[in-house]
């Protein structure tokens, strides 16, 4: 886990934003904003980050939804594992005929898993919509169907972190009803993934945390990381 955060200082900030923000009629998310430095995303496409990070604690304000595309035993196993939706290739083709329906599908589900030998048949239908949303299906061979339950469970605890045009990462790391200690552990998991990508903690310039409708507050980083 990342050592960029000091436990006591981080907990103070998290408690302050949770206790200081007015209560809403819904369970607000806790969002993380990481500002990077020394990275030129325009000149070096490899500098972009696009990863799925498994969090130690699942945010409770919204269920992460997983859809599985495949056929036969693959879909049966997905149903048993509690996938939020299972789709056969023919269903994907039918949905793709209606652009509005395809966009609705893309927006409704956070992650997609596809049976490896099925994906080439459907990529032309879903690629133009899922690609820009960074939701292209995770490939899983039919012979690895026994791994589906663990993969679905892992994705339910995961968030995607990515840079777009600017060296800034926005992601969800919790919900307002979580313990401050759990949120700090989730933040550490995200920072660890960023550190592994760039192999240099000093690439992380500033870190902010906020509730959905609350102001952002900066998290102090450990001294001497440069």
Curated annotation (Swiss-Prot):
GO terms for biological process: regulation of translation; translation. One of its GO terms (cellular component) is large ribosomal subunit. It holds the Pfam family Ribosomal_L1. InterPro entries: Ribosomal_uL1 (IPR002143), Ribosomal_uL1-like (IPR023674), Ribosomal_uL1/biogenesis (IPR028364), Ribosomal_uL1_3-a/b-sand (IPR016095), Ribosomal_uL1_arc (IPR023669). Gene3D superfamilies: 3.30.190.20, 3.40.50.790. One of its GO terms (molecular function) is structural constituent of ribosome. The keyword Ribosomal protein applies. Keywords: Repressor, Ribonucleoprotein, Ribosomal protein, RNA-binding, rRNA-binding, Translation regulation, tRNA-binding. Part of the 50S ribosomal subunit. Binds directly to 23S rRNA. Probably involved in E site tRNA release. Belongs to the universal ribosomal protein uL1 family. This is Large ribosomal subunit protein uL1. It comes from Korarchaeum cryptofilum (strain OPF8). The gene is rpl1.
